[in-house]
A protein has these predicted regions:
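Conserved alpha-helical substructure of the radical SAM core
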Residues: 122-151
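Auxiliary Fe-S-binding modules of radical SAM enzymes
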Residues: 1-88, 242-250, 258-348
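Canonical Radical SAM [4Fe-4S] cluster-binding loop centered on the CxxxCxxC motif
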Residues: 96-133
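Short linear Ser/Thr-Pro motifs
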Residues: 70-72, 106-107, 120, 190, ...
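A generic beta-sheet turn/junction motif
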Residues: 85, 96-98, 193, 205
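Conserved AdoMet/S-adenosylmethionine-binding subsite of the radical SAM
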Residues: 142-151, 156-316
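A short loop-to-beta-strand scaffold at the N-terminal edge of the catalytic core in hydrolase folds
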Residues: 89-94
């Protein structure tokens, strides 16, 4: 069977040409899938009956299956559990912002990074998601809302830069004016600091925002909560991020989870300010740690968080304490997880 989801206009035209189908039908098919959210070939009534039958007999649109949906009490956040064709499961989140709808997608089934504060990594990494599976998360939310998706953040389960090729291709398709027409400037990739592919992404020349999961200001603390720190020293990570900024001129976002008695002291606030002041126009997201069933980590007091924020800001750095969306439905930062049959690997 020929998979049609995750194919560019040119790829679909090539498939149709091989089977003696008129070229213009490819654009009609894209319109059905990505704009009308019609996935049943028999309901694509612009196509002649013979073409609908050929598509039914030879092609598939393998969207993930929606298993469950949770909606936050204020109605602004929706989390969905999706099942892939191999029964692997991932979660994705839709957030209604003042500027439109933003989707947080997963890039892998599980995660190998082992960050102690994150539920996504508890079962280890099972596999990478395909281009169609990443794209499908956005398409499903479009179908649920019947609204244009405004922005995409690759901040769900997985380390996006470990699944580099599939993530990049999915974002390129989302950017394609014929498909979803989402600006690269409305896309963010979050990384734990997978150094080689930070450089690689910088050299793509795309104005995608990079968010670094920093979470500590020295190697010792970072290694204790993020095992990837044992592979890449903090200076290596920051050098790569500086290269990304210098190459793309895109504002860097630093994610810093606040964990009481771990990384939330005033000394660490000063250290964070000193690091970030060297990145022009950067922004720091302070994220109070979110609980989940796997961990017993606690957020600092509101007073502590505000003082921490003020110290970072005193270095001339833009900083906010993130407004959590979806924590009531386990859809906030660090709470997404995946269900799958077996553990593949953990990063050590």
């Amino acid at each position: 069977m020929i998979e049609l989801l995750g194919k560019s206009l040119e790829e679909l035209q090539s498939i149709f040409k091989t089977h003696n189908i008129q070229k213009f039908r490819a654009k009609q098919l894209i319109d059905y899938i990505y704009h009308r959210y019609v996935f049943d070939f028999q309901e694509m009534t612009q196509f002649p009956k013979e073409l609908r039958q050929w598509l039914s007999d030879n092609c598939i649109i393998s969207l993930p299956t929606l298993i469950t949906e949770s909606i936050s009490p204020d109605g602004k956040t929706r989390k969905i559990l999706l099942e892939m064709t191999d029964q692997s499961r991932v979660e994705a989140v839709l957030m209604e912002q003042h500027y439109g709808y933003s989707v947080c997608v997963s890039s892998q089934v599980g995660c190998a990074m082992g960050c102690v504060f994150c539920a996504s990594t508890q079962g280890g990494l099972y596999r990478d998601l395909t281009v169609a599976e990443i794209l499908g998360q956005v398409v499903i939310f479009g179908a649920l809302t019947k609204e244009q998706i405004h922005s995409v953040v690759v901040m769900g389960a997985g380390e996006p830069l470990q699944n580099y090729d599939n993530v990049l291709q999915a974002l390129q398709l989302l950017h394609d004016p014929v498909i979803c027409n989402i600006s690269y400037r409305k896309m963010t990739i979050s990384t734990c600091g997978w150094v080689p592919n930070i450089y690689k992404l910088a050299d793509e020349g795309l104005p995608i925002t990079l968010a670094l999961s920093l979470h500590a200001t020295n190697n010792e603390v970072r290694r204790s909560i993020m095992p990837v720190g044992a592979r890449y020293e903090l200076t290596e990570v920051l050098d790569a991020v500086k290269y990304y900024y210098d190459t793309t001129q895109r504002r860097i976002t630093f994610e810093y989870i606040l964990i009481d008695s771990v990384n939330a002291s005033m000394e660490e606030a000063h250290a964070l300010g000193k690091i970030c002041k060297d990145f022009p126009n950067c922004h720091v997201n302070l994220i109070p740690v979110n609980g989940n069933e796997h961990i017993e980590l606690y957020k600092p007091s509101i007073t502590n968080m505000n003082t921490f924020k003020d110290i970072v800001a005193s270095y001339g750095v833009s900083v906010t304490v993130r407004k959590e969306m979806g924590d009531a439905i386990q859809a906030a930062c660090g709470q997404l997880k995946a269900a799958h049959g077996r553990k593949k690997e953990n990063y050590e």
